Amino acid sequence: MNTMPTAKTLMLLLCLLSVAAQAQDPAASETEQNESAASSQANNPLANFTAFNLHNYYIPELSGPVEETANSFILRYAKPFGKWLMRASLPFNRTPTGISMTESGLGDLDVFFAYLFDTGNPGRSFGIGPQFVFPTATEDATGTGKYQVGLAAVYFDATSAQFQWGGLLTYRTDVGGDSDRAKTSVFAAQPFYFMQMGGGYYLRGAPVWVFDLENDTYHIPVGLGIGKVFKSGNTVFNVFAEPQFTILHKGDGQPQFQLFVGFNMQFK
């Protein structure tokens, strides 16, 4: 006699739980989508957000007879305005100058402006524009002593929530400065690739391949590291560590191994 009310009660509870679960799914799904979007855009150099980054390259081994280590700590600021994005980088370098000798100081200020094209897909970003380098170095060894101009082009593809990729190409040459210093002609290519692992964690690589056309030297590293993206308020934080190994090089003083670490902030 009492089995029917019990069965009805259980059926009612199951229905209520099902309705509650369905009501919560959109919110949970939206949260997951927001977190996924933040992670996929956290490494986009053309993201439409003001950004401030702290990057460091520690180089414990250089090619040739150089025995000292090198280091480059970089302050990087990016600011969109209209259809343009400005990115400025100021390094503080420690550079070997001989056996058991190094010089430390500010490096050259590097600024480029990228015009952002409408690709027709919000997941794809492309920008191209002029690059300017100013001789702000405080020591001869930490800069070129030259004013330089060039061109920069950037592409970033975030159409996949799991895998993002792209690249940065730059070329610059000197147009003035200290006449006693060597001329400059440098081409650089930076492929980047990121695989989302869930929970804000991701695998990454963003090595810079540098070709000094004036001195006929180059180094080509590959990188594989790990990072973590998390959000606090309106700021997206991104921390990472990426070992980079040089697979091809020509000339003395080229990095053989470097550890690239960073702390990025995007302000929304």
Per-segment meaning from a language model:
Residues 1-39:
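Cleavable N-terminal export/targeting peptides
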Residues 25-268:
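Transmembrane beta-barrel domains of Gram-negative outer membranes and organellar outer membranes
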